[in-house]
Amino acid sequence: MMVAHTAQQLDLREKLLTNGVHSLSDIELLAVFISSGNNKKSCLQLAYELTKHLGNLRNILNADLQSFKSIHGLGEVRYAQLQAAKEICHRSDFIDLQKEIQLSNTQQTYAFLKKRLRDYKNETFAALFLDSQHRIIAYEELFSGTINTATVYPRPIVERVLQLNAAALILAHNHPSGLSDASQQDFAITERIRDALDLVDARLLDHIVIGDNEVYSIFAENKWVCN
């Protein structure tokens, strides 16, 4: 049985190397990642069971350890590798964003923030810190809360602005509900942070709310915030 499983693995790798990674199905990609099966299941069978259990690649990437381990033959090592691969992709996206001499590509910024934040199960508050030319200094996730709220304090944000010598920043947070509409609390904290940044001559450029499929720009939709 193991000989047959090994042949399957080699066939998949050969297909990838010959025809390119885009020629593989989602299950085949997972099988290449899983790499090896066990005495009872091939890597392809494990990939099929994982997909059947969790539904799609996005769900698999965002699954918790217990859900991942519920497939017999998959454990902590593969889960850790999967999370590492996911983070590598995130950091690669950030490198692409940093290549912008100035942060003028709004859609690219939205796409980056959406990819980083939308799959978190708890509300997470983040910031892009920028220099005076609106070049990116850092991306940091600053506060994390429950499924429907995160307590946000302006003071640590201002302190981080001073530490990084940032001249401007873009705030973002996710709504685990999937809805991107801003709440009254979102408007209130935006104004508090904007006022706090004014005291240190830093500018708040926007506050983005991340839903499942959409983003909401508080500044674009509510010009009063910019005044």
UniProtKB/Swiss-Prot annotation:
MPN domain residues: 102-225
GO molecular function, one term: metallopeptidase activity
Domain of life: Bacteria
PROSITE patterns per UniProt: MPN (PS50249), UPF0758 (PS01302)
GO biological process, alphabetically ordered: proteolysis
Keyword Metal-binding in record: yes
Binding locations of Zn(2+): H173, H175, D186
Keywords assigned: Hydrolase, Metal-binding, Metalloprotease, Protease, Zinc
Keyword Ion transport set for record: no
InterPro entries (alphabetical): MPN (IPR037518), RadC_JAB (IPR025657), RuvA_2-like (IPR010994), UPF0758 (IPR001405), UPF0758_CS (IPR020891), UPF0758_N (IPR046778)
UniProt motif (JAMM motif) ranges: 173-186
Matches recorded under Gene3D superfamilies: Cytidine Deaminase, domain 2
Protein family: Belongs to the UPF0758 family.
Protein name: UPF0758 protein LPC_1989
Organism expressing this protein natively: Legionella pneumophila (strain Corby)
